[in-house]
Swiss-Prot record:
One of its GO terms (molecular function) is snRNP binding. Plays a role in pre-mRNA splicing as a core component of the spliceosomal U1, U2, U4 and U5 small nuclear ribonucleoproteins (snRNPs), the building blocks of the spliceosome. The lineage of its organism: Eukaryota, Fungi, Dikarya, Ascomycota, Saccharomycotina. InterPro entries: LSM_dom_sf, Sm, Sm_dom_euk/arc, snRNP_SmB/NAA38-like. Component of the Sm core complex, present in spliceosomal snRNP U1, U2, U4/U6 and U5. The core complex contains SMB1, SMD1, SMD2, SMD3, SME1, SMX3 and SMX2 (Sm proteins B, D1, D2, D3, E, F and G, respectively), and is probably a heptameric ring structure. SMB1 specifically interacts with SMD3. This is Small nuclear ribonucleoprotein-associated protein B.
């Protein structure tokens, strides 16, 4: 563990972006960058790694009568990468500062301001897009000759289901024409529908 100088009276609010080692009631240790906390001491750790001693290794930790105090223990600790993690405050025993943040407070403030400006810019652009109606571009005269016949073919469904079995395109054009009145259909109740 590296020794980091932190004020004795520092609180969790002062330790945001610091790398912390969190001990829990079940004996597990979580190491990660503190991102947020709340009044219940629920912690959000970024790039979190979980370390725990497996049950098979617990016997080596228990003191034995025949062993001497100077013996070294070969205990294998299991590590697991968790990523972004929320720890329940009810389970937390203590927190220890592992490492200082990568950026100083001033650099973090500058970074946060930049991120805030970018977010505001994106929301402003999104709102402007929603306000403006979609632009309809007029095709070039050179391209219009090639695309006009293709667009008509695409707009008209060729299935016999739509044109009633005959290949008369003119009969089906009113369906895609905005000037034609909308067709009204008789109400067909679904199966099991009862009128009151």
């Amino acid at each position: 563990m590296s020794k980091i100088q932190v004020a004795h009276s520092s609180r969790l609010a002062n330790l945001i972006d610091y790398k912390l080692r969190v001990l829990t009631q079940d004996g597990r240790v979580y190491i990660g960058q503190l991102m947020a906390f709340d009044k219940h001491m629920n912690l959000v750790l970024n790039e979190c790694i979980e370390e725990r001693v497996p049950k098979t290794q617990l016997d080596k930790l228990r003191p034995r009568k025949d062993s001497k105090d100077g013996t070294t223990l070969n205990i294998k600790v299991e590590k697991r990468v968790l990523g972004l993690t929320i720890l329940r405050g009810e389970q937390i025993l203590s927190t220890v500062v592992e490492d200082k943040p990568l950026l100083s407070k001033k650099e973090r403030l500058v970074r946060d301001k930049k991120e805030k400006k970018q977010a505001q810019k994106q929301t402003k652009l999104r709102k402007e897009k929603e306000k403006k109606p979609g632009k309809i571009a007029k095709p070039n005269t050179a391209n219009a000759k090639h695309t006009s016949s293709n667009s008509r073919e695409i707009a008209q469904p060729s299935s016999s289901r739509y044109n009633g079995g005959n290949d008369n395109i003119g009969a089906n054009r009113s369906r895609f024409n905005n000037e034609a009145p909308p067709q009204t259909r008789k109400f067909q109740p679904p199966p099991g529908f009862k009128r009151k």
